[in-house]
Amino acid sequence: MKKKNKKKLSNSSPKNNINQVDFKGLNDLFENNLNLYNSFVNGAASKNEKPKKSSVKQDFKPKDLYELISPTTDRIFESLNAFNAKIHKDPKLSFENVHIWLEDIVKLNYYFISKASNKKVDPIIKPNIADQRFSSNEWSENLFFDFIKQFYLITTTLLENLVEKGVFEDPKQKEYFKFYIKQVIMALSPSNFVFTNPDILAKTIQEGGQNLIRGYENYRKDNLKHPNKFYISQTKFDDFEIGKNIATTKGKIIYKNNIFELIHYNSDTEKQFEIPLLIIPPFINRYYIMDINEKKSLVKFLVENKINAFLMSWKNPNSDSRDHGFKDYIEDGVMEAIKVACKQSGSPKVNLASYCIGGTLLSMTMAYLKNTKEKNSINSATFFASLVNFENFGDLQMFISEEQISSIEQVMKKVGYFDGRNLAATFNFLRPGDLYWNYVVNNYLLGNEPSSFDVLYWNNDSTNLPEKLYSDYLRSL
């Protein structure tokens, strides 16, 4: 790739000290790389590469993120109106908090002047020790970035306090607004922008902007992989292969129907306990969370310790599965797996272990068996991270409303299922800093490849949900 007007930036320090940036050269460099970026956008990354035709829409617009967070605009406007009404009814609340904010800004300016004069002063505010966005030394040692960081933290504290200390007529409105404020706060973090993140700026200078070119290519690949899902890679998918370095415990499929497949694992011992163990994983992810690798495998531990282990693997629903509901997943899923495990092992009873929504399904199965004349072959039941009481299920309730559910049902009517990638995106925005913006910075701005992480490989290997099942889940639970 040829570069025009390439200039060397003055750099008196091998560590690319940001305090000594040649801003004239930097301006020329970014103008040059903007032209390169536009070449990529237009499909001409190099003279030897012909633009590739694609029916996929490449442009990402702000409304895509907006609709992903909340497909019903009424919800946000209701929250804004409720918050605005609260401020007008209680001007003392805004006055007190804005007064504190102004005091902190004055202190921050004094801090800035004192530090510039080589005086030793303590920062006005520090990030949470668990906040990795500002872990780089430059955020504290470089006065410019230190000021930006503290100004951001002071301002976000103001916003959070206004919401937290406000008394809303409807408590749900407060929770909604807290959620939306969190999304805005994380999105506007100075760590998410080239010129306000010291690590990105240093790398851009050092590499002549090539990190941004690689970052755009990473974005393009993500968008081609999952168009219109605003998907971002969290791990190197090519580094993992089922049966090779993921899900390596030996076993075989002994039963299958249109709901699930049942895996029976090979015994490593001469003798086994009489009662087998049947594992029920969540039906929104793949089965191998219980068998990630040899060092992180519950299944391997079980078979090595004389447990006769069975594991359900839910089939990935398609349009033909639209009418499958909880009754099918109970009768043709869990109950059928219990029967097969008992028959295969010769035991009249089976122990059950469940994870996440697999535990929710197990609790429903147990209630179903208690209220029917069906034979109950459950000896014991264990639940890992399973939600049973849905009275308060945290930030997930931000996505649950009549408008939201109706919108989802309209989408499902067209295809017969809910796309698991949409559900995965929802979970990412429950922890936007760790599961979304962290990867925007690493993949798109620093131009790095994501690291190899087997658990994130599993987390991104999502499955679809049948139309009836998901609709019943949203409305009934």
Please report, for each region that a protein language model flagged, where it lies by residue.
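Alpha/beta-hydrolase fold nucleophile elbow
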Residues: 341-357
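Amphipathic alpha-helical
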Residues: 226-237, 459, 463, 467-472, ...
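Generic recognition of stable, solvent-exposed alpha-helical segments in well-folded globular domains
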Residues: 150, 257, 279, 288-289, ...
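Alpha/beta-hydrolase active-site loop
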Residues: 323-344
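Short, surface-exposed "cap/lid" segments of acyl-processing enzymes
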Residues: 227-241, 248-318
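Alpha/beta-hydrolase-fold enzymes
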Residues: 167-202, 343, 347-348, 365-470
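Amphipathic, low-complexity, repeat-rich surface-exposed segments
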Residues: 1-259, 272-273, 310, 375-376
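Flexible loop/turn segments at secondary-structure boundaries
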Residues: 270-271, 284-288, 317-322, 357-363, ...
